[in-house]
């Protein structure tokens, strides 16, 4: 097991994985902020390095969470699957991002394009439900 770990560390060094993460991580964080901080359904964008999350809220100004019975996070995950992106729903309708450490900046852009399309589809779905409930 130790030999495998040592070989893995050698590969990380050969491909400069740490340098790559130091380059791509800030790009991921900046893109998360740029794309989602002002979205009406996003109450908070948070993260560090190659890990991030967006918190989905019903009312951005009041930071009011959705009713848990509506399962908004899992519904966004489903839309993500339809867009070809894997999302992780967490407590309080937060969606987590933890892409592979070898992801490129272009792939981050593509991933977040798909997340945006998923969030847009969920927004349309929720508006339809609101109209139907009236």
Label each residue range with its predicted role:
Residues 1-134:
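Conserved N-terminal phosphate-binding loop of PLP-dependent enzymes in the Aspartate aminotransferase
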């Amino acid at each position: 097991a130790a030999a495998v770990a040592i070989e893995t560390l050698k590969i990380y060094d050969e491909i400069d994985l740490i340098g790559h993460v130091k380059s791509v991580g800030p790009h991921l964080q900046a893109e998360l902020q740029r794309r989602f901080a002002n979205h009406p359904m996003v109450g908070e964008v948070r993260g560090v390095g190659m890990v991030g999350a967006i918190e989905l809220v019903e009312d951005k100004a009041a930071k009011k969470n959705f009713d848990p019975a509506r399962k908004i996070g899992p519904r966004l995950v489903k839309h993500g699957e339809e867009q070809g992106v894997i999302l992780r729903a967490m407590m309080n309708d937060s969606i987590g991002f933890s892409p592979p450490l070898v992801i490129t900046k272009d792939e981050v852009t593509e991933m977040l394009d798909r997340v945006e399309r998923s969030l847009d589809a969920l927004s349309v779905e929720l508006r339809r439900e609101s109209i139907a409930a009236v």
